[in-house]
């Protein structure tokens, strides 16, 4: 039984960590922290957990976190870096859901996250494992510092990884169009995330320099064995949960459909969570966010365009589960020797 502390447990991601870990048979949650709600019952902030826990929020501190064997950090970008060195030095396993340890290049934090100086702990950047289980499974075994990928990066990387791995990416950068629900803005959000502004919206934001580009390019470069650049534009849309990405990859030689199935199965054939959706019949012939909500499932698909030598790829995930808390727990399971799907065996709800 692993004793777990969730630091920053009052937000959407923290709430999902609580929901998942309360169902995990190998975990005891010993603390859930929140400055704003310290002393309050967890279920009063996360009403869906009523009747499942009597935990109360406590003031966050290193000393509190050190009571656990494992700490999940669900903190804003730029905050985890203040916690990780002390926790890591103390021997506690850390699963960081912020971006603070995702990028291997210390200087990248100046460009992509507007830090005033390069990352202060370059040694820890190299020790951190990028927590995408299908692509880093061996590295995750026994890992003590895991950087959980970003939500839109998760969908984009898994969607394009087979093409990068098997040499289909040309010198023309892939174009990725992403759509994300309002929960991606967090529990506090901004004025444009209020219902009256968000309803009916399809709105681009950070259309040419979104920070998730850095980790997408980092991972695709690793898989391809050469520098990969992408064009990436996200859109806020009128749903609460979910991310849908469409990739346009212009190739020198169009693969056959049989080849595409072979590439996807070679990379993901053993995955408990990835489904390849490309059906000739049925009501959902390609990936659809609607059929992954509340789960750690990734639905991937593709189509071929011989007119333009274009491979069109698709990915659908729940941004709060596979894009954050669920992927963190999946990585935790591998690192700690639990079954990979422990706590994550939810079947999607339909209709919804």
UniProtKB/Swiss-Prot annotation:
Question: Which reaction does this enzyme catalyse, per its entry?
Answer: [amino-group carrier protein]-C-terminal-N-(1-carboxy-5-oxopentan-1-yl)-L-glutamine + phosphate + NADP(+) = [amino-group carrier protein]-C-terminal-N-(1-carboxy-5-phosphooxy-5-oxopentan-1-yl)-L-glutamine + NADPH + H(+); [amino-group carrier protein]-C-terminal-gamma-(L-glutamyl-5-semialdehyde)-L-glutamate + phosphate + NADP(+) = [amino-group carrier protein]-C-terminal-gamma-(5-phospho-L-glutamyl)-L-glutamate + NADPH + H(+)
Amino-acid biosynthesis found in the keyword field: yes
Example GO BP = L-arginine biosynthetic process
Q: Which residues form the active site?
A: 151
What are the GO cellular component annotations?
A: cytoplasm
Q: Which residues form a coiled coil?
A: none
Family note: Belongs to the NAGSA dehydrogenase family. Type 1 subfamily. LysY sub-subfamily.
List, alphabetically, the NCBIfam families matched. argC
Q: What is this protein called?
A: Putative [LysW]-L-2-aminoadipate/[LysW]-L-glutamate phosphate reductase
* Species this protein is from: Pyrobaculum islandicum (strain DSM 4184 / JCM 9189 / GEO3)
């Amino acid at each position: 039984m692993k004793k777990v502390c969730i630091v920053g447990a009052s937000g959407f991601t923290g709430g999902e960590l609580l929901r998942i870990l309360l169902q995990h048979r190998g975990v005891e949650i010993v603390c859930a922290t929140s400055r704003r709600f310290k002393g309050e019952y967890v279920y009063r902030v996360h009403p869906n957990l009523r009747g499942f826990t009597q935990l109360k929020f406590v003031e966050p501190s290193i000393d509190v976190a050190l009571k656990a064997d494992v700490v999940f950090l669900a903190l804003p970008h730029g905050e985890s870096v203040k916690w990780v060195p002390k926790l890591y030095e103390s021997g506690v396993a850390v699963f960081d859901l912020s971006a603070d340890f995702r990028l291997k290049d210390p200087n990248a934090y100046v460009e992509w996250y507007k830090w005033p100086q390069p990352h202060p702990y370059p040694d820890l950047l190299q020790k951190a494992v990028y927590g995408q289980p299908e692509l880093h499974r061996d590295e995750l075994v026994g890992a003590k510092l895991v950087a959980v990928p970003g939500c839109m990066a998760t969908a984009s990387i898994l969607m394009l990884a087979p093409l990068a791995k098997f040499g289909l990416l040309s010198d023309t950068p892939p174009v990725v169009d992403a759509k994300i629900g309002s929960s991606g803005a967090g529990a506090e959000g901004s004025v444009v995330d209020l219902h009256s502004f968000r309803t009916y919206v399809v709105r681009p934001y950070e259309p040419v320099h979104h920070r998730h580009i850095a980790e997408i390019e980092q991972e695709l470069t690793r898989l391809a064995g050469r520098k990969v650049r992408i064009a990436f534009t996200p859109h806020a849309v009128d749903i609460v949960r979910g991310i849908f990405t469409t990739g346009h990859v212009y190739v020198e030689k169009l693969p056959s459909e049989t080849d595409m199935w072979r590439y996807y199965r070679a990379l993901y054939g053993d995955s408990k969570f990835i489904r390849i959706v490309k059906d000739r019949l049925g009501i959902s012939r390609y990936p659809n966010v609607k059929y992954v909500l509340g789960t750690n499932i990734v639905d991937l698909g593709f189509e071929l365009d011989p007119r333009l030598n274009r491979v069109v790829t698709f990915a659908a995930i729940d941004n709060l589960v596979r894009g954050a808390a669920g992927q963190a727990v999946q990585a935790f399971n591998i690192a700690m020797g639990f079954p990979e799907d422990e706590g994550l065996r939810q079947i999607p709800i339909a209709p919804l």
